[in-house]
């Protein structure tokens, strides 16, 4: 297979390496021999990478190295265990990273949930109770002209569940100057979410609801996952 970005040096440290990707140097973390994410990241930095992917930031040491690498010009991608995109900021600070370092290095945080997809073989229309329909239409302009809403009935193709496959719903936080200032001043998650809401940035629930309105998933699944 041809490399995805032939002119760039892309290096990862993963635990484990699940897929081999052409053109990317992939390092498997092995904590039992001392090759954890932090040590793997140190080794990567000696290879003059353009892009670094760290499988997961689990501790201060890994977070500190990753953030300092990003401040020297490398693009750094990683994952954190948080409930939403704003929670990534709090998680890094709680690990011990100085807020000013988080604000100066973080460019974007993206939260993801998986929704069950309605089975296409038993997809059927159903009626939403009037008050709930009015609430949805008042909150989501996309629903105002929609007259058909769907769910899965259950069939042999989906083992009677009404669902077949999954789809991702995302919440993306693009860090602007206002958010950087809020992070540096250690403003609360609630303050940041309030600012994003005023900007019209949609959260996980909003984006999941759009998947329901457009017929991809069920209302029950929206409430379950978000």
Question: Where are these predicted regions, by residue range?
Answer:
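Short, flexible helix-loop junctions that flank or precede catalytic/ligand sites
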Residues: 1-226
